[in-house]
Amino acid sequence: MIQSQINRNIRLDLADAILLSKAKKDLSFAEIADGTGLAEAFVTEALLGQQALPADAARLVGAKLDLDEDSILLLQMIPLRGCIDDRIPTDPTMYRFYEMLQVYGTTLKALVHEKFGDGIISAINFKLDVKKVADPEGGECAVITLDGKYLPTKPF
């Protein structure tokens, strides 16, 4: 039976335990996701408390991380999503995304509405991918793909 969580702390505590086990075992998120049939980003999102994993995937990652049965069950429960505090992020990486939306948010909104009309980009029917690519000027760049279904506003 599908179960749901009403308290974000239990999943955040589990995420802390998962990250500790991941570090002790020297595993990458890609290695943990391997064999689940799910995207690395989706499995990572679940391990950090923002998604529910199917039972088979939860058992597989649970075995890789030496999680107990209760933790494996928690990974399958629908979480209380959106655990970022209602304040400006202080973590430098998360702040840069906040900053990007502050700078480019109105541009993204204008371009999306111009190309699609009034509506939103789904965060439910959504895919996320992060790639590291060489910068022709030296160093490396992050290519972040946000792929969400467009949902038009419907008058009623």
Swiss-Prot record:
Keywords: Lyase. One of its GO terms (molecular function) is DNA binding. Transmembrane segments: none annotated. InterPro entries: Cyanase (IPR008076), Cyanate_lyase_C (IPR003712), Cyanate_lyase_C_sf (IPR036581), CYNS_N (IPR048564), Lambda_DNA-bd_dom_sf (IPR010982). Its EC number is 4.2.1.104. It catalyses: cyanate + hydrogencarbonate + 3 H(+) = NH4(+) + 2 CO2. The active site is at 96, 99, 122. It comes from the Bacteria. One of its GO terms (biological process) is cyanate metabolic process. Catalyzes the reaction of cyanate with bicarbonate to produce ammonia and carbon dioxide. Belongs to the cyanase family. NCBIfam families: cynS, PRK02866.1. PANTHER family: CYANATE HYDRATASE (PTHR34186:SF2). This is Cyanate hydratase. The lineage of its organism: Bacteria, Pseudomonadati, Pseudomonadota, Gammaproteobacteria, Enterobacterales.
